[in-house]
Swiss-Prot record:
Any one GO MF annotation of this record: L-amino acid transmembrane transporter activity
Catalytic activity entry: L-cystine(out) + L-aspartate(in) = L-cystine(in) + L-aspartate(out); L-cystine(out) = L-cystine(in); L-aspartate(in) + L-glutamate(out) = L-aspartate(out) + L-glutamate(in); L-aspartate(in) + L-glutamine(out) = L-aspartate(out) + L-glutamine(in)
Compartments, as annotated in UniProt: Apical cell membrane
Quaternary structure, from the entry: Disulfide-linked heterodimer composed of the catalytic light subunit SLC7A13 and the heavy subunit SLC3A1.
Gene Ontology cellular-component terms listed: apical plasma membrane
Gene Ontology BP term (one): aspartate transmembrane transport
Protein name: Solute carrier family 7 member 13
Family the UniProt entry places it in: Belongs to the amino acid-polyamine-organocation (APC) superfamily.
Primary localization: membrane
Bilayer topology annotation: Multi-pass membrane protein
Keywords: Amino-acid transport, Antiport, Cell membrane, Disulfide bond, Membrane, Transmembrane, Transmembrane helix, Transport
Family annotation (Pfam families): AA_permease_2
């Protein structure tokens, strides 16, 4: 390996990259596929549903700014892991990492399958996509993206920016089309907005459900806790990215929903499995076949950044001694190749074994549990270290509001649809102790793994990073 240049994760990403990264991470497939949860729990009241979308943006801003405090205070790739380790101990931090291994692999597997389904769907217009070609294409896309991610930040940068431009362009096209339909003033297009609040008003329980549905659509703002170590001037870059991306997402979400409601009736939206395709079929019948390809192309960016960001905590945990030294290595492109390889391998297994995907659906609620711990950590730090110099602070009401929302995201699924799978998920999280106690607490070393580490270093041309000057 050429050692003319230092091998380490470098701070090479600036404001524009960070903004596009946050945009992609928040805007997922939901706005294209099924943005109907808010409308359903708003009792198909158009005015209430749009108000919920706007209100959820404010709630999302509070939680995102809380995550920004963690990212700025600990500007390293995997700040969430380091924060948990500092304020709750190494055991909790390891269990968070253990959970994220399964959650991260499940996310990339689900995104790869969704990407494959939308890519193949136009070739099967009258039936569902066969499982075998869908899985084969998903595996191919997953490994292609993994290889591109391992090639370093240059490949990631141009692919991410191109994909984000495409995604925003598609949503802008949908939004502008809705505006044009409204300006034309046809009765069937404007009547739903002239009497937006005339429908039945939702009761408090349905309204809370609608808020949780909308809040989930804005999730993803905590992504800077995973890649802060590669941002230039994170203290100023992160807040600027947040205050650019989140208002833009809010406007886009509102305009896209208005466009859907302009072209389709609320009942048509609720009955559709892919609202964007139904919308295209109604607004531009001759171009409807393009929408699945456009959606799949935009979903490519989500898969790209999911692999990119989920590999960073693995790398940091290895630096902290909670994972084998093998995962603390970088290739000649200064990319954590072995961390990416582990994530892609686990994602491939999740694609092949579809029952694992079902289990991953129940793991998602653990993300809210970890978010609650992070918010408690912020409050704990303010109480235990009141004189600590913190470069960026949020109002205490922000973490408290985030705790309330996250508690609801944990409790409501348990109350609404109790399932034994949640017990399995808890056991899966706690099973991390079977590895933590012997290998980390008692520091048992496996000689054969150390030999394999040396062999893999030669095979993949990887090495330990140089000492950072920070």
């Amino acid at each position: 390996m050429d050692r003319g240049e230092k091998i380490q994760l470098k701070r090479v990403f600036g404001y524009w990259w960070g903004t596009s990264f946050l945009l992609i991470n928040i805007i997922g497939a939901g706005i294209f596929v099924s943005p109907k949860g808010v409308l359903a729990y708003s009792c198909m009241n158009v005015g209430v549903s749009l108000c919920v979308w706007a209100g959820c943006a404010i709630l999302a801003m509070t939680s995102t700014l809380c995550s920004a405090e963690i990212s700025i205070s600990f500007p390293c790739s995997g700040a969430q892991y380091y924060f948990l380790k500092r304020y709750f101990g190494s055991t909790v931090a390891f269990l968070n990492l253990w959970t994220s291994l399964f959650l991260g692999s499940g996310v990339v597997a689900g995104q790869a399958l969704l990407l494959a389904e939308y890519s193949i769907q136009p070739f099967f217009p009258s039936c569902s996509v066969p499982k075998l070609p869908k899985k084969c294409l998903a595996l191919a896309m997953l490994w292609i993206v993994g290889i591109l991610t391992s090639r370093g930040v240059k490949e990631v940068t141009w692919l991410q920016i191109a994909s984000s431009v495409l995604k925003v362009s598609i949503l802008s096209f949908i939004s502008l089309t809705g505006v044009v339909f409204l300006i034309r003033g046809k009765k069937e297009n404007v009547e739903r907005f002239q009497n937006a609040f005339d429908a039945e008003l939702p009761d408090i329980s349905h309204l809370i459900q609608a808020i949780f549905q909308g809040y989930f659509a804005y999730s993803g703002g905590a992504c800077f806790t995973l890649i802060a170590g590669e941002l230039k001037k994170p203290r100023t870059t992160i807040p600027k990215c947040i205050f650019t991306a989140l208002p833009l997402v809010t406007v886009v979400y509102l305009l896209v929903n208005i466009s859907y409601l302009t072209v389709l009736t609320p009942r048509e939206i609720l009955s559709s499995d892919a609202v964007a395709i139904t919308w295209a079929d109604r607004a531009f019948p001759s171009l409807a076949w393009i929408m699945p390809f456009a959606i799949s192309t935009s979903l490519f960016s989500n898969l790209l950044i999911s692999i990119f960001k989920s590999s960073r905590p693995i790398y940091l945990a290895s630096q902290e001694g909670q994972l084998p030294l093998l995962f603390n290595t970088l290739n000649s492109h200064s990319s954590p190749f072995t961390a990416v390889l582990l994530l892609v391998t686990l994602g491939s297994l999740a694609i092949i074994l579809t029952s694992l995907i079902d289990l991953i659906n129940y793991i998602f609620f653990t993300g809210s549990l970890w978010s609650i711990l992070l918010m408690i950590g912020i409050l704990r730090r303010r109480y235990q270290e009141p004189n600590l110099s913190i470069p960026y602070k949020v109002f205490l009401s922000f973490p408290l509001a985030t705790i309330v929302i996250d508690v609801g995201l944990v409790v409501i699924p348990l109350v609404k649809s109790p399932n034994v799978h949640y017990v399995y998920v808890l056991l899966l999280v706690l099973s991390g102790l079977l590895f933590y106690i012997p290998l980390i607490h008692f520091k048992i070393r496996l000689a054969w793994f150390e030999k394999m580490t040396c062999y893999l270093q030669l095979l993949f041309n990887i090495c330990l990073p140089d000492v950072s000057e920070e």
